[in-house]
Design a protein with these regions (language model features):
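Ribonuclease/tRNase effector modules and their secretory precursors
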Residues: 1-95
């Protein structure tokens, strides 16, 4: 159950992502793993992108708020399950 009042600001999303990373509660959907494999993005790469990337404003997609986290050549899309739990929905390399 998601108890967050979403959407959150990009800076709050970054704080929540860092909390999820610190607690070790970042999960990957099967879709994310498939898309990451297609682009040669490892789970470690995705976690690094979440840690160092810039968070864009949330988008409401398929009944949940999703936040793109962008670095120069890749994007990871995450959603929150709680204030300290995140799920990677998809990821891709920018070509």
């Amino acid at each position: 159950m998601n108890l967050l009042d979403e959407p959150v600001t990009p800076s709050d999303a970054k704080r929540l992502i860092l909390q999820a990373l610190a607690s070790g509660d970042v999960r990957f959907t099967s879709h994310a793993l498939d898309e990451m494999a297609k682009d040669g993005i490892t789970q470690a790469d995705a976690l690094g992108i979440l840690r160092s990337g810039v968070v864009e404003p949330g988008e409401f997609v398929k009944s949940s708020w999703r936040y793109r986290v962008r670095v120069r050549r890749a994007v990871v899309v995450s959603a929150f399950r709680s204030e300290c739990s995140a799920v990677v929905v998809t990821a891709w390399r920018i070509r």
